[in-house]
């Protein structure tokens, strides 16, 4: 995204930056001259086609997730509604990054008069990406809270997490994240905004980690207590723990894919002139690729961890021209 993160493309300053596709800032140039491996300070080039391709793949995958959850009534549960919210956020992040690649290409090829309009479009895209990032974090936290309730408040769960209440929670998440994302971009020239975003990221991770430490420490004891009750409490608790493990994988992938970007922000505000920090920040395009990969990996995790969702995926795909492949696979 367009920012002054040591190698920004635009003269306007924003904290989210898409680099200059092979060029670098004056500050980076001066740092590179003083070191024998000055090439480290060259902004890593990634072909625009890569961003567009990843955006299209993410779009198709996450639309499949959303349609599957809407189609299958067995998936109409709080956890899957929150997963649907996460899928929307993932889709917007990747599609917006892909769209921004096109905007940047236009910005480089248009005249000065048209560039101001293109920059405004890019600012809108930045706001969408920032809002989607916040929505992703909040959706993951919501899934963690939902798993916590299913394990420790199993008997009261359906009274606590009603469909109406879940709908209100998701609506509030997106409303708050949209407003926050817009404000972050408007005031992105301020270092305080970057610090606020970094703080939110690590605070949410700390909250989720706290929930999981408590969940996995107490889960076995709680399962034993539920097991003495009539019905299928043990089976239900086993399914709930499977959902908790799925979320653990999702959070792990999220951290791996987003951590380099937030480390980039930390370096930007703490050591922008340090040669090692500049070298790390020169790989910003790679960190954007990781972010887009997160949006592609998440639907694969859903499919691998949920037999019901996997079954629905197959039903949807078989309704289209690819149905012949489904018939062929069912014969062998």
From Swiss-Prot:
Q: Can you supply one Gene Ontology CC term for this chain's record?
A: plasma membrane
Its primary localisation, in coarse terms, equals membrane
Q: Which residues lie on this side of the membrane: Cytoplasmic?
A: 70-81, 146-165, 216-248, 305-332
Topological domain spans for side Extracellular = 1-43, 107-123, 187-191, 272-280
Coiled-coil features, chain-numbered ranges: none
Q: Which residues are glycosylated?
A: 2, 17, 26
Q: Where is the lipid attached (S-palmitoyl cysteine)?
A: 318
Q: Could you give a GO molecular-function term held by this entry? A: melanocortin receptor activity
Q: How does it sit in the membrane?
A: Multi-pass membrane protein
Which keywords fit this entry according to its UniProt record?
Answer: Calcium, Cell membrane, Disulfide bond, G-protein coupled receptor, Glycoprotein, Lipoprotein, Membrane, Metal-binding, Palmitate, Receptor, Transducer, Transmembrane, Transmembrane helix
Cysteine disulfide links:
40-279, 271-277
- Localization per Swiss-Prot or TrEMBL: Cell membrane
Residues binding Ca(2+) are 100, 122, 126
List the InterPro entries.
GPCR_Rhodpsn (IPR000276), GPCR_Rhodpsn_7TM (IPR017452), MC3-5R (IPR001908), Mcort_rcpt_4 (IPR000155), Melcrt_ACTH_rcpt (IPR001671)
Membrane-crossing segments per the record: 44-69, 82-106, 124-145, 166-186, 192-215, 249-271, 281-304
Give the protein family: Belongs to the G-protein coupled receptor 1 family.
**Function field:** Hormone receptor that acts as a key component of the leptin-melanocortin pathway at the intersection of homeostatic maintenance of energetic state. Plays a role in regulating food intake: activation by a stimulating hormone such as anorexigenic alpha-melanocyte stimulating hormone (alpha-MSH) inhibits appetite, whereas binding to a natural antagonist like Agouti-related protein/AGRP promotes appetite. G-protein-coupled receptor that activates conventional Galphas signaling leading to induction of anorexogenic signaling in the hypothalamus to result in negative energy balance.
Q: Quote the subunit structure annotation.
A: Homodimer; disulfide-linked, also forms higher order oligomers. Interacts with GNAS. Interacts with ATRNL1. Interacts with MGRN1; this interaction competes with GNAS-binding and thus inhibits agonist-induced cAMP production. Interacts with MRAP and MRAP2; these associated factors increase ligand-sensitivity and generation of cAMP.
By what name is this protein known?
Melanocortin receptor 4
Q: Which organism is it from?
A: Vulpes vulpes
């Amino acid at each position: 995204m367009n920012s002054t993160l040591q190698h920004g493309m635009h003269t306007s300053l924003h904290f989210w930056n898409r680099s200059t596709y092979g060029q670098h800032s004056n500050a980076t140039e001066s740092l590179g001259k003083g070191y024998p491996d000055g090439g480290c300070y060259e902004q890593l080039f990634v072909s625009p086609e890569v961003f567009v391709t990843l955006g299209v793949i993410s779009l198709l995958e996450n639309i499949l997730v959303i349609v599957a959850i809407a189609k299958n009534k067995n998936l109409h549960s709080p956890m899957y509604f929150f997963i649907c919210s996460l899928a929307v956020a993932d889709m917007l992040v990747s599609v917006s990054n892909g769209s921004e690649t096109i905007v940047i290409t236009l910005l480089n090829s248009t005249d000065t008069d048209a560039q101001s309009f293109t920059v405004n479009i890019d600012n809108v895209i930045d706001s969408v990406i920032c809002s989607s990032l916040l929505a992703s974090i909040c959706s993951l936290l919501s899934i963690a809270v939902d798993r916590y309730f299913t394990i420790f408040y199993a008997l009261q769960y359906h009274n606590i997490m009603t469909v109406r209440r879940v709908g209100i929670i998701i609506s509030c998440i997106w409303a708050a994240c949209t407003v926050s994302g817009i404000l972050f971009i408007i005031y992105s020239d301020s270092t305080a905004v970057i610090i606020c975003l970094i703080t939110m990221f690590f605070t949410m991770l700390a909250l989720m980690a706290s929930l999981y430490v408590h969940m996995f420490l107490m889960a076995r004891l709680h399962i034993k207590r539920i097991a003495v009750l009539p019905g299928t409490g043990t089976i239900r608790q086993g399914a709930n723990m499977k959902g908790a493990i799925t979320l653990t994988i999702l959070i792990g992938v999220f951290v791996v894919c987003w951590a380099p970007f937030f480390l980039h922000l930390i370096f930007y505000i703490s050591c922008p002139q340090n040669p090692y920090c500049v070298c790390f920040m020169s790989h910003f395009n790679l960190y954007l690729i990781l972010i887009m990969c997160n949006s592609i990996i998440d639907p694969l995790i859903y499919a691998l961890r949920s037999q019901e969702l996997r079954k629905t995926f197959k039903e949807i795909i078989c309704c289209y021209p690819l149905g012949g492949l489904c018939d062929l696979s069912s014969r062998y």
